[in-house]
C-alpha cells in the first residue's frame, strides 16, 4: 500500500511539473526558447518570399521582442516599402516601441505607417499620443483635429481638444487679468481693451472647449455622472 501511495505521489508530482512547464511554454514567446532575432528574421524573409504575409508579420513581431535593433535594421534594408505588408511591419515596430516607451521611435514608425494609410484613425490617435509624449503639443493638436475630420465622435480627440482649449482659455484669461491689475488708474480705452480681450477668450477658447466637451457628453453620456 505504501508503494502504491508513493507511486501515486510521484505521478501527481510529475503531472504538476508537466503542467507548469506547459504553462510557461505558452506564456513565453518563441524567441525565448532559443531563436535569435536573426534566425526569426531569416524566417520572415522566407515567409515574405512565399507570400505568407500573416506568418511573416507574426515572426516579425517575435523578432522585435528578441532584438529590436536588428529587426528595425531588417525593416529599413530588406522590406519592400511598396509592398502591401510593409505598413503592417511598420505598425509592429510602432506598437513595440510604444510599449517600450521609446516614443521617438514609436512616432517614427507610426508616421511610416501613415504614409500608406493617412486616414487610419487608430494610427492617427496613437501618433498624436506620441507627439504629446515627445512634447510636441501643437503637432498633437493638428493630428487630433485631423482625427475629428475623419471621426467626429472620437472620444480621445474630443477630450484632448476640449481640455487643450480650456487650459488655453484659463491661461489667456489669467494674463489679461494680471496685466489689467498692473494698471493703477485704467482709462476707459484700457478698460475697453480688457473687456474685449475677455470677450475674445470666452468666445473663442472657452467656446471651443465647451463644444468639444459637450460632444463628449452627447456621445458618452455616462461620463457626465463620473
State where each predicted segment sits:
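TPR alpha-solenoid repeat register
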Residues: 72-74, 89, 123, 157, ...
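Conserved structural position within tetratricopeptide repeats
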Residues: 65, 112-115, 146-149, 211, ...
Amino acid at each position: 500500500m505504501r508503494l502504491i501511495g508513493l507511486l501515486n505521489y510521484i505521478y501527481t508530482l510529475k503531472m504538476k511539473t508537466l503542467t507548469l512547464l506547459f504553462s510557461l511554454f505558452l506564456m513565453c514567446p518563441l524567441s525565448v526558447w532559443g531563436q535569435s532575432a536573426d534566425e526569426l528574421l531569416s524566417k520572415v524573409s522566407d515567409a515574405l518570399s512565399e507570400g505568407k504575409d500573416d506568418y511573416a508579420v507574426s515572426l516579425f513581431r517575435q523578432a522585435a521582442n528578441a532584438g529590436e535593433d536588428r529587426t528595425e535594421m531588417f525593416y529599413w534594408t530588406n522590406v519592400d516599402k511598396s509592398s502591401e505588408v510593409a505598413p503592417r511591419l511598420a505598425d509592429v515596430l510602432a506598437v513595440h516601441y510604444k510599449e517600450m516607451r521609446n516614443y521617438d521611435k514609436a512616432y517614427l514608425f507610426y508616421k511610416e505607417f501613415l504614409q500608406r494609410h493617412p486616414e487610419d484613425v487608430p494610427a492617427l490617435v496613437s501618433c498624436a499620443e506620441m507627439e504629446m509624449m515627445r512634447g510636441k503639443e501643437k503637432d498633437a493638436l493638428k493630428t487630433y483635429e485631423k482625427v475629428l475630420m475623419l471621426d467626429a465622435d472620437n472620444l480621445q480627440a474630443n477630450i484632448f481638444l476640449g481640455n487643450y482649449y480650456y487650459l488655453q482659455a484659463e491661461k489667456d484669461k489669467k494674463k489679461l487679468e494680471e496685466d489689467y491689475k498692473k494698471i493703477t488708474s485704467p482709462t476707459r480705452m484700457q478698460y475697453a481693451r480688457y473687456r474685449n480681450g475677455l470677450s475674445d477668450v470666452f468666445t473663442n477658447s472657452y467656446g471651443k472647449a465647451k463644444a468639444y466637451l459637450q460632444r463628449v457628453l452627447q456621445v458618452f453620456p455616462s461620463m457626465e455622472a463620473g
